[in-house]
Each structure stands twice: as structure tokens, then as C-alpha cells.
Design a protein with these regions (language model features):
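Active-site bordering "gate/hinge" segments
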Residues: 1-197
Length: 197
């Protein structure tokens, strides 16, 4: 994923001047350049970026020594200040990837639960799966094939997609149900009752 694609994604996420944006990065230091590109892209749009890295190796060490008092309401209240979150993962998020004692794992799980509860309160929350070999392992594709496909999928005209979506939203205004036919006996029906667009 190059800088140009990252800039397009950040802009398409709605980042605007004067906002406070959390770049929540799931990855090790080896992939930190990716996080740095997201941070600089946020700043280039006139918003204030803040980086929080969730590296498995660092989290293991933190939660092996952390106490209950480390992550109280004051800590989590910091996250309610953000206008937007860019949740960027170079590998599967939340999974610690290490065995730690049950009491430490319980603290880690509570931390993650409370963190995501606060982040969900932000006005915008965008998740971005970075084309990496680690993410490819979950796709059942060869790493280079996965990376190539994902880079191509991200390298689109987001403004054109937005306009097309707005057009379709108007077209389906007032619709109660949409049915999609994708082949013989392949039908997907969506109930739109009460849906706010």
C-alpha cells in the first residue's frame, strides 16, 4: 500500500480541517511506516493526528506487568475526544498472539472491550485492512495475489463511488425491500424498513 493510496483512503474517510483523528494501528514496528503514512495524510488535510499502536509484542509486555489501576475511566475518557478513528490493521486486530496467565488475559480483554466501546462513540470509525502477508494468511490466497488484489481494490476513485452511492440512495428512497439476484437460485433479499440512509 503506497502513500498515494493511503492519502486517497484518508480523504475518502471524511477527514477534514480542524478535526482530531486517532490512527489506531494494529502492527509491529516493522510495518510502522504504514501507520506513519496515515498520520501524515491526516495532517496534510489539516486535521490533528494521534497515533496509538497496538503491537502484539508490546501489548504482551504491557499486560504481563499491568495492574487493574493502569486503565481506569480517566484513560478511556481520553478516547471520547476524537472526531474520527482510522482503525488500520497490518494483522488481525485484538488477537494477542501470545499465551499469558489468565488474570493478565482477562485484563487485556477488558481493556479491549472498554477501548472499543469508547472508540465506537466517535462520529466516524473507518477500518482499513492493509495488504500484508499476515492478512493474506486469513484470505486463502497466495500472499502476492492477495496484496495485488487489495492494492487494486483500494486504488479507486472514491469521489465517483460516493456519488454513485448517493445516486442509488436517492433511487431506493422509500423502498421497503431490495432483492439481488446473482445467479440461478441465488437470491439475497434485504429488508429496508426503517432504514436511515
Amino acid at each position: 500500500m503506497n502513500k498515494e493510496i493511503i492519502s486517497k483512503i484518508v480523504k475518502a474517510s471524511g477527514v477534514s480541517e480542524g478535526e482530531l483523528v486517532l490512527v489506531h494501528f494494529w502492527g509491529e514496528d516493522a510495518d510502522k511506516d504504514i501507520a506513519n503514512h496515515f498520520v501524515t495524510s491526516v495532517a496534510a488535510l489539516g486535521a490533528a493526528p494521534v497515533l496509538l499502536q497496538q503491537a502484539r509484542s508490546i501489548n504482551r509486555d504491557i499486560f504481563l506487568s499491568a495492574k487493574e489501576s493502569c486503565f481506569d475511566d480517566r484513560y478511556f475518557d481520553l478516547f471520547s475526544k476524537f472526531d474520527a478513528v482510522l482503525d488500520v490493521f497490518a494483522y488481525q486486530p485484538v488477537v494477542l498472539g501470545y499465551s499469558i496467565e489468565n488474570e493478565h488475559m482477562l485484563l487485556y480483554r477488558r481493556y479491549m472491550s472498554q477501548l472499543f466501546h469508547k472508540l465506537a462513540e466517535c462520529r466516524r470509525f473507518t477500518q482499513i485492512r492493509v495488504p500484508t502477508e499476515a492478512n493474506a494468511a486469513e484470505s486463502n490466497l497466495e500472499p502476492q495475489d492477495y496484496i495485488q488484489r487489495m492494492n487494486k481494490a483500494y486504488n479507486i476513485d472514491y469521489e465517483m463511488v460516493k456519488k454513485a452511492c448517493e445516486h442509488e440512495t436517492k433511487r431506493f428512497a422509500g423502498a421497503k425491500k431490495v432483492t439481488v439476484y446473482t445467479g440461478t437460485d441465488c437470491v439475497l433479499s434485504l429488508d429496508l424498513t426503517g432504514r436511515t440512509w
